[in-house]
From Swiss-Prot:
Subcellular location field: Cytoplasm
Naturally occurring in which organism (per UniProt): Rattus norvegicus (Rat)
Stretches forming ANK repeats: 2-31, 58-87, 91-120, 127-156, 160-189, 193-222, 225-254
Motif, Nuclear localization signal: chain positions: 935-938
GO biological process, one term: postsynapse to nucleus signaling pathway
Primary residence: cytoplasm
Domain SAM: 810-876, 884-949
Protein name: Ankyrin repeat and sterile alpha motif domain-containing protein 1B
Tissue-specific expression: Isoform 3 is brain specific and highly enriched in the postsynaptic densities (PSDs), especially in cortical, striatal and hippocampal PSDs.
Residue numbers spanned by region Disordered: 298-326, 368-402, 491-513, 556-642, 754-778, 946-989, 1197-1217
Domain PID as annotated: residue spans: 1056-1213
Length: 1260
């Protein structure tokens, strides 16, 4: 160890000359050494020289010392002599961790790029921290920039569930915070219940960081267990941060998990700081109250000439109004929370709400009812979305209005996601926690006896729009008649005053598919509910900072429309109730509506409508057209949209009937769901729409594009005629069962151009258009001509700029939606888990029947149905088709949406498209470790046909497998693997392919030191599912003195709570008459390989199985049908080892408790590396089980022993087979529970062995 110690000391002190002298006897690396065989003298000097990867007592290698002390030249020299960058010290730190902690950007770059050994940027230490955590915590912005460029995952959480952004915010690293949120803005929404970056920054008083986070769009009202960020800042006395949060509009009434507000916390900690903060809060609340009063007085002056119904919530007296609103909200909130605590049904909750509104209406005085009895009541009640966010037309947008109601209705408190249900709400399936709009209709003097039921059914089912404020807004109808009418007005809008600008959404909205899916989950009411979904076509003065996406549903049609924020003038609207009878329709729907009163019906049909059904009743003579519409001037004035214009229907003349009978007026119902969305975000989204109809013989939707980037559907109002029932039924059969597969992707070529629509819709009328007055008809015909001319011009422009729009395109939908459209949603997990996760890349040249069988779809009828549906999907076009030639590997992978593999390709030497065109599927499996068959098939389909006439040739002699000992011997695979198992037309030589892949992958790198963890574990680490290990494992090299392996493959919790699954070929088992440890495994392996080599037919029968390894043992699972064949307990496994003749073959010995016989089970892995990992995982499973048993024994709780170790008999220690095996001293007291787990490395001395190191484990 003398030279090793000298090397370590020279690296620590920066003595370049001594390092070079000590390592000069070794062969030079890629920077200084030549190629070719080494003379004997050099080999001897290597034997006598120091080990470049030797470690000291703390686990530091020379590279650790050099990186920590900033010796750049030493780092370069060590890498030149093949030092490994992926050796961890005793605390799990890699050299890149130390360089990032020190802030040495040059050394970080060298470790990542220089080679031959390259650092893995996402490697974690024992605290689960990456190098990005170290750099972010200490504010090394240059290092952070380099790591972000190298695709370091910023979502990985350490053992305290902290991301790099959390650490930067906690320690006030402003520049780092800006860099991370600029590169990954989605991190601000990926928070835990323990903390958020905003809470951490507020707690430590980092005012600048708090401002940056809020400016970047972080929700100021986001909550954790400790409440809002205001709680944290107040508790720790950060006055400046409190001031910033209050100015941003945070709700001061938010409560923490203990039910305490900020003022409650201040009372518990009286101090000078608490007094200052309390004063700030008081001034803020008083200022908000004054601003609300001023705006209300201004609003009342504007409406002083209007006739309005009085209400306690709109009293001119400030004190009366404030007390009334506060009292009503308090009572309502208490009852809602009571309903939640007692787990009442949603119907009870809605009944509670409706009772309050009924009470409000009953308070209207008889005097004002007499004055306004001839006026129609327009009532729109909406519910506050989140504290501090009020868009009431009479309140300042930054004021703090009534709070707590929406939090009581939704499980995700404080998340401002305007118009979109949170994903967390799916855990509350019994409560429809989506926005509700309560729209009571008609004058009170018309049918006062029906108010209660009417309000109840409206509350129960009118789930159409997420409101943004709690208000009871009333406005008189501009009409002169007494017809009952209902209107939904956009939040913050009014008929007679300018609207206030409300806050824009802080969260990015989901895709249209996700939105539709969430809506469908909501609009599924309980059966036999009386339902009336009432809304209006009249949306006025919409906020100019937002876009509104509508879902307008009528009896059998759905439109999905994106419209710009417009301000059409007030127009009269007629709405009514409809009767839904599922798929049953009569010849005369209008007569049925006029003759029959409303009945109870199942509104489940609306769920189907939102999936894209087309009109099922009457259609206009001309199809609907899309036309572009832009804002006309900055004053917000806009002509009335045709989509918002009323449709005529027959009713009794109002002039002759002041109090019309409501039952005789049954106009149709149209409901709309409004989604708020940032205007600029739409430009970067994939646009959804319908196929364009070019031919004149087919009536379909057409596309319109305008410079403003907005598209809206409008009805071409021509003659409306009734359709025969047969045509209606045929139309229903074609469209009612349609799913979202009608949605087609049209990538926008210009950010200003947006195409958005849904399948074509049609409006119906109960009577013919001939009953219109002549002037009315002529006006609509004139408008019809104008719209047609606009439509023609727009479509001609679209044809010129988007010529390929008529090409068949792949529907923009998930695999689950596609499977649902063909009636097989149960196979979604089968497809996505195996790489068939994108319908754009699942054409007939990608997926085959054998693939479906392999992934576990055993029903032949279902496979045929899937294959038939796949024929309708577009085939993948190989590179070079249509002149497309990607210039880089990254560009090509991004084009097939497999960009995550970019780094794997580049690291393994696939740096050009020429190399990629020669890649084989075996290389994808063995070299690139692409285990998902769907991704492999996608890659091969994109690369085109394989050149079977040019198979890989014999590898050059320089290709070798590298071992820790430094010896070089060419790998030899078993004859069984070189047979026809993997052959293609008899021309594929498997050993040569694997060695060619190894040549590109390893070059001169250390082969066994750079084994990555499984993909599942990387995902678990990124999501923070693994926390602090519950047990402490000894490293393999400490568990046994004879192994060089320094770290395990998996997190201990993985083997305790889950399992590690590996695919392998099962060659068979052999009865062991005399148990001789690894000698028995060698004999069994040799016999099984000999059996497979006897005939090709025998080799074809070798089954593929899955070994599921955990601390309990090994489950033996059939890979075809996922059935568990057998389960071998850990206590019954006595030995596991690789075969020295073929390291890809391994075996383990189990004991049959019934017969008391031992059997050796033999497997062949896909490559040597996988076999090594399986054996190492088995060893870790033994270690985990052993440590669990020790914990149970030391704690004195025998009942806590794992099941596999209870009543475990002791076993004799077998005699070592090879003399160089180092004995392990074992405490006799520990032998009774579970013995030490030695890992044995036996340097091969026989020339017949392909690789001279094998990995074994033995249980005594």
């Amino acid at each position: 160890m003398g030279k090793d110690q000298e090397l370590l000391e020279a690296a620590r002190t920066g003595n370049v000359a001594l390092v070079e002298k000590l390592l000069s006897g070794r062969k030079g690396g890629i920077l200084g050494g030549g190629s070719g065989p080494l003379p004997l003298s050099n080999l001897l000097s290597i034997w006598r020289g120091p080990n470049v990867n030797c470690t000291d007592s703390s686990g530091y290698t020379a590279l650790h010392h050099a990186a920590l002390n900033g010796h750049k030249d030493i780092v370069l020299k060590l890498l030149q002599f093949e030092a490994s960058t992926n050796v961890a010290d005793n605390k799990g730190y890699f050299p890149i961790h130390l360089a990032a902690w020190k802030g040495d950007v040059e050394i970080v770059k060298i470790l990542i790029h220089h080679g031959p050994s390259h650092s893995r940027v996402n490697e974690q230490n024992n605290e689960n921290e990456t190098a990005l955590h170290c750099a972010a915590q200490y504010g090394h912005s240059e290092v952070v920039a380099v790591l972000l460029e190298e695709l370091t995952d910023p979502t990985i959480r350490n053992s305290k569930l902290e991301t790099p952004l959390d650490l930067a915010a906690l320690y006030g690293r402003l520049r780092v915070v800006k860099m991370i949120i600029s590169a990954h803005p989605n991190l601000m929404s990926c928070n835990t219940r323990k903390h958020t970056p905003l809470h951490l920054a507020a707690r430590n008083g980092h005012k600048a960081v708090v401002q940056v986070l809020l400016e970047a769009g972080m929700d100021v009202s986001c909550q954790t267990e400790k409440g809002s960020a205001l709680h944290e800042a107040a508790l720790f006395g950060k006055v400046d941060v409190v001031r910033v949060l209050l100015e941003t509009g945070i709700d001061a009434n938010i409560k923490d998990s203990l039910g305490r507000t900020v003022l409650d916390i201040l009372k518990e900690h009286p101090s000078q700081k608490s007094l200052q903060i309390a004063t700030l809060l008081q001034d803020y609340l008083e200022g908000v109250g004054r601003s609300v009063v001023l705006e209300e007085e201004h609003a009342q002056e504007d409406t002083a000439q209007e006739t309005r119904l009085s209400s306690p919530a709109q009293s001119p007296s400030q004190k009366t109004k404030s007390e009334t609103v506060t009292g009503e909200l308090s009572k309502l909130l208490d009852e809602i929370k009571l309903c939640q605590e007692k787990d009442y049904s949603f119907e009870d909750l809605c009944h509670t709400i409706s009772d309050h509104y009924l009470d409000n209406l009953s308070k209207i005085s008889e005097e004002e009812l007499g004055k306004n009895g001839s006026q129609s009541v327009r009532t729109s009640s909406t519910i506050n979305l989140s504290p501090g966010e009020v868009e009431d037309e009479e309140e300042d947008p930054n004021s703090c209005g009534p709070t707590g109601l929406w939090e009581a209705l939704t499980p995700c408190n404080g998340c401002r996601n305007l118009g979109f249900p949170m994903l967390a709400q799916e855990s509350y399936p019994k409560k429809r926690n989506y926005p509700m709009e309560i729209v009571p209709s008609a004058s009170l003097d018309t049918f006062p006896s029906e108010n209660e039921n009417f309000l109840c059914e409206l509350v129960d089912t009118a789930v159409t729009k997420k409101p943004c404020s709690l208000e009871i807004a009333r406005a008189p109808s501009p009409r002169t008649d007494n017809a009952s009418e209902v209107a939904i007005t956009a939040p913050g809008t009014g008929h007679h005053r300018n609207s206030s600008t409300g806050p824009t959404p802080d969260c990015s909205p989901p895709s249209p598919d996700t939105a539709l899916k969430n809506i469908v989950k909501v609009i599924r009411p309980q059966p036999k509910q009386r339902t009336s979904i009432v809304s209006s076509l009249d949306f006025q003065r919409m906020n100019h900072n937002q876009e509104y996406f509508e879902i307008s549903t009528s009896t059998g049609c759905t439109s999905f429309t994106s419209s710009p924020p417009v301000s059409p003038p007030t127009s009269s609207v007629e709405t009514t109730e409809i009767k839904n009878e599922g798929a049953e329709h009569t010849d005369d729907l209008s007569q049925q509506e006029d003759d029959e009163p409303p009945k109870e019906y199942d509104a489940g049909q609306f769920a189907g409508l939102l999936h894209g059904s087309s009109p099922a009743c009457e259609a206009p003579e001309n199809p609907f057209h899309l036309y572009g519409k832009r804002n006309q001037g900055e004053d917000g004035q806009e002509e009335a949209s045709l989509a918002n214009s009323p449709l005529p229907f027959k009713q009794t003349p109002i002039e002759n009937n002041p109090e019309p009978s409501v039952k005789k007026i049954k106009p149709k119902v149209v409901s709309r769901t409004i989604f708020h969305k940032r205007s600029h975000q739409l430009e970067n989204h994939t646009i959804v729409g319908t196929r364009m109809s070019r031919g004149g013989s087919r009536n379909g939707d057409q596309w319109g594009v305008n410079p403003g980037g907005f598209v809206e559907r409008a009805c071409t109002l021509g003659r409306i005629r009734s359709l025969p029932k047969a045509l209606i039924d045929m139309h229903l059969s074609k469209n009612v069962s349609k799913s979202d597969s009608d949605l087609i992707a049209y990538p926008s070529k210009d950010k200003a151009r947006v195409n958005w629509s849904k399948s074509s819709t049609a409006e119906r009328s109960s009577k013919d258009n001939s009953e219109r007055t002549p002037s009315f008809t002529s006006e609509w015909e004139e408008i019809d001509k104008i719209m047609n001319s606009i439509d023609v011009g727009i479509n001609s422009e679209l044809e010129g700029m988007n010529g390929e729009a008529t090409r068949p395109r792949c529907p923009v939908q998930t695999v689950g939606q596609w499977l649902e459209s063909i009636g097989l949603p149960q196979y979604e997990n089968h497809l996505t888990a195996n790489g068939f996760d994108n319908v754009q890349f699942m054409g007939s040249n990608v997926m085959e029947d054998q693939d479906l069988l392999e992934i576990g779809i055993l029903n032949s009828g279902h496979r045929q149905r899937i294959l038939q549906a796949i024929q309708l999907l577009p085939k993948m076009r190989p590179i070079g088709h249509d002149g497309y030639h990607p210039t880089s590997v990254a560009e090509w992978l991004d084009s097939i949406e497999l960009g995550d593999y970019t780094k794997a390709f580049l690291i393994n030497g696939y740096t050009s498209m020429d190399l990629l065109k020669k890649i084989w599927e075996l290389e994808l499996i063995n070299v690139l470790k692409i285990s998902l068959i769907g991704h492999r098939k996608r890659i091969l389909a994109s690369l085109g046909d394989r050149l079977h006439e040019d198979p890989p040739q014999k590898p050059p002699r320089s290709i070798t497998l590298r071992e820790p000992s430094g010896n070089h011997t060419p790998p030899q695979l078993s004859p069984s693997l070189s047979q026809s198992t993997y052959t293609t037309g008899g021309s594929l030589d498997v050993p040569h392919i694997i060695m060619q892949g190894d040549a590109r992958r390893r070059r001169n790198e250390n082969y066994f030191d750079d084994i990555p963890r499984s993909k599942l574990e990387r995902q678990m680490a990124q999501t923070g599912d693994w926390g602090e290990p519950s047990i402490t494992l000894r490293p393999p090299n400490e568990a046994t003195a004879s192994t060089p392996v320094q770290y395990w493959q998996h997190h201990p919790e993985k083997l305790i709570f889950q399992s590690c699954d590996y695919k392998a070929f099962y060659l068979g088992s052999m009865l062991i008459k005399e148990l001789r440890g690894t000698e028995s495994t060698q004999d069994a392996c040799a016999k099984m390989r000999a059996n497979c080599q006897k005939s090709t037919e025998q080799m074809k029968k070798v089954p593929t199985i899955i070994l599921s390894v955990s601390y309990k043992g090994v489950k033996f699972i059939d890979a075809a049908n996922k059935n568990i064949i057998a389960e071998h307990e850990i206590r019954n496994i006595s030995c596991a080892a690789q075969d020295p003749e073929d390291l890809s073959t391994f075996a383990y010995i189990t004991k049959d408790l019934k017969s008391n016989h031992h059997y050796c089970h033999v497997f062949t892995a896909f490559d040597v590396n996988l076999a090594y990992e399986i054996i190492l995982t088995l060893g870790q499973a033994f270690e985990v089980a052993y440590q669990l048993a020790l914990q149970a024994r030391k704690g004195g709780h025998s009942s806590t022993l794992p099941e596999s170790f209870e009543n475990k008999p002791s076993k004799p220690i077998p005699k070592p087979r090879v003399s160089i095996r180092k004995s392990v001293q074992i405490d006799p007291s520990e032998q009774k529970t579970l013995a030490n787990l030695p890992w044995i490395v036996e340097p091969g001395q026989e020339a017949k062995r392909g690789i001279n190191t094998k990995y074994e484990t033995t249980i005594f």
